[in-house]
Amino acid sequence: MADILTQLQTCLDQLATQFYATIGYLTTYHDNSPAIPPDNPTSAPALAKIQKNSTNPPIPAGAAAILNASQGSPSGAATGAVTPGPPAPNASAGSGAGEAGAARQEEGLPPRPDSPRTFTARQRELARDLVIKEQQIEYLISVLPGIGSSEAEQERRIRKLEEELRAVEEEREKRVRELRVLRRRVEEVLGAVEGGIYGGSSY
């Protein structure tokens, strides 16, 4: 039973690790494509337009407009919903500086998303691994002692095991007493042999 419990704990730890790895992959390598709009357009608030692979969380369009107005736009032309994000690179800079800035900006971005076919294939593979691990856990639980037995049957089994344990303990104590008797006899024989060898000899 202890071995089954150890395997069950190991499988649970592995399942938690697989959950974490799956969520990490889906979050990192998703292409962030817009979802199909629902039939009811008012079921969720509209979100402000964000740049692809932006690390900033999406915010409602109304909140973005209020934020833009609170920043004190002098011309009032910036009425579109804009999500706060990193400043755009300077367009007046030279080509070399622009490439360097783009490279620096590329370093801070997350990895490129997988293609839809690759993403779907890996998503299915991760889901299959989760199902297999869950089936292993169900099997280990099914072979645990007491599964499918009533409370009375488990109590009878416990009492029977207690009786067997007491019988084994009594047998062990009996063997220990016999061992002590045999040890005393061996010590007496060794003492007699030692006395016979060294006691009667004279020089």
Swiss-Prot record:
Keywords: Activator, Coiled coil, Nucleus, Transcription, Transcription regulation. It is found in: Nucleus. Pfam families: Med21. Signal peptide: none annotated. GO terms for cellular component: mediator complex. GO terms for biological process: regulation of transcription by RNA polymerase II. It comes from the Eukaryota. InterPro entries: Med7/Med21-like, Mediator_Med21. Residues 74-83 have a biased composition (Low complexity). Residues 70-118 are annotated as: Disordered. The keyword Transcription applies. Its main location: nucleus. One of its GO terms (molecular function) is transcription coregulator activity. The keyword Cytoplasm does not apply. Residues 147-190 form a coiled coil. Belongs to the Mediator complex subunit 21 family. Component of the Mediator complex. Component of the Mediator complex, a coactivator involved in the regulated transcription of nearly all RNA polymerase II-dependent genes. Mediator functions as a bridge to convey information from gene-specific regulatory proteins to the basal RNA polymerase II transcription machinery. Mediator is recruited to promoters by direct interactions with regulatory proteins and serves as a scaffold for the assembly of a functional preinitiation complex with RNA polymerase II and the general transcription factors. This is Mediator of RNA polymerase II transcription subunit 21. The gene is srb7.
